[in-house]
Amino acid sequence: LIPMYEPSNQQEAYDMVYNGFNFSEQTGEPILMRMVTRLAHSRSGVERKEQQPQNEISFSEDPRQFILLPGNARKRYKALLQRQDEFIKASENSAYNKYTDGPNKKLGIVACGIGYNYLMENYPEGCEYPVLKIGQYPLPKKQLHQLIDSCDEILVLEDGQPFVEKQ
């Protein structure tokens, strides 16, 4: 229910944390960064962004938002449900979710996080199939339907548990 970012490389991991903090500040909701072992245990140079000024210490007007006892959690859950359309819209417009068309429509590929790198390693000249790269959740429904409607079969590439595959 909360927005999640899943980087495919080190630069994306850096950028997603940077943008994730901004998104969290704008929405007042936490975000989740999904890091897989292979990416977490790797290193690479990244292009740094301009450092933002440190926020002043301020206390929340409603400290209950940080205390998730059952009564508070139920209220927060309802609020999260009401904001799903906002999160989906942000995901639809995210630069981290990218649809790339391909000439061969027999297969459509949904590549999540580092799965996208694995795919591109096998197609150094470019993939002949349509590919939907997922890096921000909730899933971008419009792009997903575009892929499903134009392809005969769908292959989902993801590291670890079948999170996207089961949705």
Region spans (language model):
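Flexible, low-complexity linker and terminal segments
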Residues: 7-167
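Flexible glycine/proline-rich, aromatic-decorated loop/lid segments
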Residues: 1
